[in-house]
C-alpha cells in the first residue's frame, strides 16, 4: 500500500520535461509516440519512470536487449488513454480491486452506457489495458512489443524473457 501512496503523490505533480520528450523520441517511432502521448500525463510519467528504472536494472544483467526493454516500458500501458480514468478514478478502481475484487471484475464493462457506465468502463480498462494496448501495438506492426505488453500483468512463467521480467520488476517499483 505504501507504493500506491507514493504513486498517488507522484501523480499529483506529474509532468514531462524536454529531456523526457527527447527520450521518447529516441526510442519510439511516430505511430508509437502517438500511442504514448494518447495516455494521460500521469501514465506517461509512470511509463518513463518504468523505462528509466528498467534501464538501471538491465545494467546489472547480461544479454538484455536494452532498446527493446525501453520500448516495452514506454508502451506497456498504452491500453489506457486520456479520459478512461481520472486520478481519483484510478484511486477508486485500485481500492475496489483491493477490497471488492470479485464485485469489481463482475461489473467491469467495455461499454460506458448506463448510470455507472464510466465506472464500469474504468474497471474494464484497469483489468484489460494490457490486452487493449497489445492489440493497438499489433495493429501498428509492433508484434514483438505487443506479445510482451500482453503478458506484463500475467503470472510469471519459466519461459518469460529477461526483458519481460525486468519490465514487471520496474513496473512494480513505479
Model-derived regions: residue spans:
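Divalent metal-dependent catalytic cores for phosphoryl transfer on phosphate-bearing substrates
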Residues: 33-174
Amino acid at each position: 500500500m505504501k507504493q500506491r501512496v507514493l504513486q498517488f503523490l507522484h501523480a499529483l505533480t506529474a509532468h514531462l520535461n524536454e529531456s523526457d520528450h527527447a527520450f521518447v523520441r529516441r526510442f519510439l517511432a511516430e505511430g508509437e509516440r502517438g500511442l504514448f502521448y494518447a495516455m494521460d500525463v500521469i501514465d506517461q510519467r509512470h511509463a518513463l519512470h518504468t523505462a528509466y528504472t528498467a534501464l538501471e536494472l538491465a545494467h546489472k544483467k547480461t544479454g538484455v536487449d536494452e532498446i527493446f526493454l525501453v520500448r516495452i516500458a514506454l508502451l506497456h500501458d498504452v491500453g489506457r488513454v486520456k479520459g478512461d480514468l481520472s486520478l481519483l478514478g484510478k484511486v477508486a478502481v485500485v481500492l475496489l480491486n483491493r477490497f471488492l475484487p470479485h464485485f469489481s471484475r463482475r461489473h467491469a464493462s467495455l461499454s460506458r452506457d448506463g448510470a455507472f457506465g464510466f465506472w464500469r468502463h474504468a474497471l474494464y480498462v484497469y483489468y484489460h489495458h494490457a490486452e487493449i494496448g497489445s492489440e493497438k501495438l499489433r495493429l501498428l506492426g509492433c508484434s514483438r512489443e505487443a506479445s510482451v505488453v500482453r503478458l506484463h500483468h500475467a503470472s510469471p512463467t519459466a519461459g518469460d524473457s529477461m526483458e519481460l521480467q525486468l519490465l514487471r520488476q520496474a513496473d512494480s517499483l513505479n
